[in-house]
UniProtKB/Swiss-Prot annotation:
PANTHER family reported for this sequence: DEVELOPMENTALLY REGULATED GTP-BINDING PROTEIN-RELATED (PTHR11702), MITOCHONDRIAL RIBOSOME-ASSOCIATED GTPASE 2 (PTHR11702:SF31)
Enzyme Commission number(s): 3.6.5.-
Family annotation (PROSITE patterns): G_OBG, GTP1_OBG, OBG, OCT
Annotated gene: obg
Keyword terms: Cytoplasm, GTP-binding, Hydrolase, Magnesium, Metal-binding, Nucleotide-binding
Cofactor(s) of this protein: Mg(2+)
Places the protein is found: Cytoplasm
Protein source organism: Bacillus cereus (strain B4264)
Protein known as: GTPase Obg
């Protein structure tokens, strides 16, 4: 089964917790704090594997959670960083954040990697908090939570040439005679429901990859007839071969077919119209095809170059392949998305946390709810089993301006304040 879109959940590993410890050794009368830092949590890293062709594997495993870092230890020993979780994807995979729609990565070349969910940093041990006024701190941090998100994976086939046109115009037949591909061919519409790829050799030491894409119908750009799933695969192609049934046996006018398909390409993505398009008049071995071709030429004008062929008899196919190969040599690639500098095959896509530091809302029962990335991260990294850590958290809240903001919202002694699933009393 060809699977070209799937939703999965990824989570970077939490950082290891820092430790509260002290040196208790002979001849070390003032040993001091010796708690080590926690190790960094593992990242979730997507890596391109050229042997993969679909996203089928993700139908059976949709959750990817990286390991947390090792906890800090006594004698100042830091926890070990966890090994990154490598997730293999096929070439041509686009990764989007499900919530925001942001493009996280466009993975096209073998071995290319992208960090999709960062692991959290390790919490600091108490040796990090020693000062002249507090030489033996009872403070250690929990590990930072790893980033988590739902992502959408879309596979857009990597082909130099895309065959487009209405259903049953002969795209699959053409691919089968110019390559070793064996797409399903039958006398009914939408025989092809997934892209088929074939390597085409022109006979003069040139070759390219051609994709037979499922047939389009009017309204495809808006999703009619699974149009979005089909048009998605055209985006990476450099040359579009527009196949038209010149026999008219389906009862459609070839010129109207030509106009309709081009409108769909334009409406779906303006950049599709920037690609060179080769117009192929297929089924020229059928009755009335020559007459229909002349009428078609009169309507499109002389500026549109047309290649009359018969995919069944292979008439005109050789000239068509040479023209396509020439266009590929002179046409640059069309990048789909603007991503980070690709000079390095390893790309880091950072999690944007800029914006509102915290937000205060009030529930119907009068409870004040504090939310926001910074305050929630600080809360999770606080070890509430130690009084000194609790006092430090209170200072951090004041430093963020949360105390003042609560007072401004009318908070008084004894009011309930909630962060995540935890509640405590406000003390003025």
């Amino acid at each position: 089964m060809f699977v070209d879109q799937v939703k999965i959940y990824v989570k970077g590993g939490d950082g290891g917790n820092g430790m509260v410890a002290y040196r208790r050794e002979k001849y070390v009368p003032k040993g001091g704090p010796a708690g080590g830092d926690g190790g960094k949590g593992a990242d979730v890293v997507f890596v391109v594997e050229e042997g993969l062709r679909t996203l089928m594997d993700f139908r059976y495993q949709r959750h990817f959670k990286a390991d947390r870092g090792q906890h800090g230890m006594s004698k100042g020993q830091h926890g070990r960083k966890s090994e990154d979780l490598l997730v293999k994807v096929p070439p041509g995979t686009v990764v989007k954040d499900e919530k925001t729609g942001q493009i996280l990565a466009d993975l096209v070349t073998h071995g290319q990697t992208a960090v999709i969910a960062k692991g959290g940093r390790g919490g600091r041990g108490n040796s990090r908090f020693a000062t002249a006024t507090n030489p033996a701190p009872e403070i250690a941090e929990n590990g930072e939570p790893g980033q988590e998100r739902d992502v959408i994976l879309e596979l857009k086939v990597l082909a130099d040439v895309g065959l487009v046109g209405f259903p049953s115009v002969g795209k699959s037949t053409l691919l089968s005679v110019v390559s070793s591909a064996r797409p399903k061919i039958a006398e009914y519409h939408f025989t092809t429901i997934v892209p088929n790829l074939g390597v085409v050799e022109t006979g003069d030491n040139r070759s390219f990859v051609m994709a037979d894409l499922p047939g389009l119908i009017e309204g495809a750009h808006a999703g009619v007839g699974l149009g979005h799933q089909f048009l998605r695969h055209i985006e990476r192609t450099r040359v579009i071969v527009h196949v038209i049934d010149m026999s008219g046996l389906e009862g459609r006018d070839p010129y109207e077919d030509y106009v309709t398909i081009n409108n769909e390409l334009k409406e779906y993505n303006l950049r599709l119209t920037e690609r060179p398009q080769v117009v192929v008049a297929n089924k020229m071995d059928m009755p009335d095809a020559e007459e229909n071709l002349q009428a078609f030429k009169e309507k499109v004008g002389e500026e549109v170059k047309i290649f009359p062929i018969s995919a069944v008899t292979r008439q005109g196919v050789r000239d068509l392949l040479f023209e396509v190969a020439n266009l590929i040599e002179t046409t640059p690639e069309f990048p789909i998305h603007e991503v980070a500098d690709e000079s390095d095959t390893s790309v880091m896509y950072k999690f944007d946390t800029e914006g509102v530091k915290f937000e205060i809302t009030r529930e119907s029962d009068g409870t004040f709810v504090i939310s926001g990335y910074d305050i929630e991260k600080t809360f999770k990294m606080t070890d509430f089993s130690r009084d000194e850590s609790v006092r430090r958290f209170a200072r951090q809240m004041r430093g963020m301006g949360i105390d003042e903001a609560l007072r401004a919202r009318g908070a008084k002694d004894g009011d309930i304040v909630k962060i995540l699933e935890y509640e405590f009393e406000f003390i003025d």
